[in-house]
């Protein structure tokens, strides 16, 4: 992954350490976006205490650089994006930058379901990244039960390997 990806989404310190070790072996520093769970229970650190614990440990991983925070909503736990749960990323970025000296610039506010907040002009300032692959590739926002204008919905089928799994 380190060889091919220019950044990765991470949730577990064990995986972050392994990524760091791989990056060091390759003479690289691999950028990571730390995922924060805001209630959907799909992925990410859960709660400020767990976030602080993992942030301190990331400082000891020389092969990675924490460049962003992200969240995923509208998936497993049916939590939809809101001004409140996306604003959490802005608040946590400011906290981590201040307390730990990170220079977090990327705030990844979700998937195609977050587009609705953007379209309505309600996406909090500071959210500067959305992972809209489903929208681009499949032409849909499944949580809003809508098709995205101008996109095809039958372009291909996709298969992938699961590389991280955790029970919450």
List each language-model region with its residue ranges.
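Active-site anion/phosphate-binding pocket segments in diverse small-molecule metabolic enzymes
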Residues: 14, 83-168
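Active-site-proximal beta-alpha core segment in soluble small-molecule metabolic enzymes
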Residues: 1-91, 95, 99-100
